[in-house]
Amino acid sequence: MLKKLLLSFVFLIATSSQFAHAALELVITDGINSARPIAIVPFRWEGAGPLPHDVSAVIASDLQRSGKFSPVATSKMPQTPYSETEVNFDAWTNLGVDSLLTGSITKNAEGQYVVNYQLIDIVRGQLTKGQSRALSDEGQLVLSKDHVLFNKKATVPGKRLREYAHRISDLVYEELTGEKGAFLTRISYVVVNDKDKYPYQLRVADYDGFNERLVLRSKQPLMSPAWSPDGKKLAYVSFQNGQAEIFIMNIYTGEREKVTSYPRHNGAPRFSPDGKTLALVLSKTGSLQVYTLDLASRKLTQITRGRSNNTEPFWHPDGKSLIFTSDRGGKPQIYNVNLSNNSTSRITWQGSQNLGGQITPDGRFLIMVNRSNSGFNLAKQDLETGAVQVLTKTLLDESPSIAPNGGMVIYSSIYNKTNVLSMVSIDGRFKARLPATNGRVRAPSWSPFL
């Protein structure tokens, strides 16, 4: 049984204050023209004083960042309806909008916010003028309002109003695309600031960079954070004791365990889809090799062998095999290993190098760092056909991490001569940048659904 360690670093739990000076902010760089127009009408506030967060603005930003929607600017809206009965369907149809979200917010006696909101199908409403009818259970014709895709109400504490806005974004996204939204998720990453007393900092933020919180800071390097499937823990690499060691930390309680501390290198931890096993890389026998560690029994199993270096393991969604990067062919390429029989095959062939591979949640695509004449860029490979599409044109891309719905990828790149976090949609049409203001930002990891 592993010894549970008290933190020797400074740890701040997730409820601590955010570091405003270090906040990340999404800057959209490409892809908006190809997105679907949608109207996010400013929610009516029926109370005194300002709201702690602009709910409709958060929703509009979320949908825009997905790369699939282009919210209409409020200055271009022909009207600001607050319910489906006030919608002028012809006016919105003329603007090219086929969906509209509207709502209102009040405050109850307990000081909580009551949010009412509706998603409206403008095309359907324009065809029926909002007067479609259907038979009731009693056999009478009644207004069906089938142009209202959903009509919801929620009571939310003020400190969670922005969080609930992400929830609304998820509902809208799923209703209109048929895919689960990933706006109510988090990212973890490492910030390096050589001028700070603790140059290495592990931080967690909402997917869009807001509510950034310090999780851990150290005078020695921190690397390779990876989320557990339940979103409560992070596995990471620390050099606090003079060599690379793997730890698992509960980001809510601060409790952590040292998982491995073998001679030489311990790195690249990855939780299995069921959270019971950790894939990792050790060099205790010489070259870098991939292992799996059963977290209950602590049984260590060696997966790769030989003189070549094998690293960066990542689990298939079914948990039955791993992909990893190996230089066994001379230069880094990505391979697949079946965990039941250790049969191994190379899966990347296009480009002089391919590394940092991850598989989308649906198992269809491999996302990787591809080296070609243009440098190191993110690429997507269809695992059935082998077709490869280069997704980015940024500089020295590394450490891709896929959103839990498979729609976006976050990664580290170079901008203005420093490491920043960037995003790209899975089809490569939409790109965004999350610039940091006080350090180099590396090793991003996208959380599971929360």
UniProtKB/Swiss-Prot annotation:
What organism is the protein native to?
Answer: Vibrio atlanticus (strain LGP32) (Vibrio splendidus (strain Mel32))
Which keywords appear in this protein's UniProt record, sorted alphabetically? Cell cycle, Cell division, Periplasm, Signal
Localization recorded for this chain is:
Periplasm
InterPro entries found in the cross-reference section = 6-blade_b-propeller_TolB-like, PD40, Tol-Pal_TolB, TolB_N
What gene does this protein come from? tolB
Q: Which GO terms describe its biological process?
A: cell division; protein import
Family membership = Belongs to the TolB family.
Protein name from the UniProt record: Tol-Pal system protein TolB
Query: Sorted alphabetically, which SUPFAM superfamilies does this protein's record hold?
Result: TolB, N-terminal domain (SSF52964), Tricorn protease N-terminal domain (SSF69304)
Q: What does this protein do?
A: Part of the Tol-Pal system, which plays a role in outer membrane invagination during cell division and is important for maintaining outer membrane integrity.
An annotated GO cellular component = periplasmic space
Could you say which residues form the signal peptide? 1-22
User: What is said about its interaction partners and assembly?
Assistant: The Tol-Pal system is composed of five core proteins: the inner membrane proteins TolA, TolQ and TolR, the periplasmic protein TolB and the outer membrane protein Pal. They form a network linking the inner and outer membranes and the peptidoglycan layer.
A Pfam entry, by short name: PD40
- Known PANTHER family for this protein? PROTEIN TOLB, PROTEIN TOLB HOMOLOG
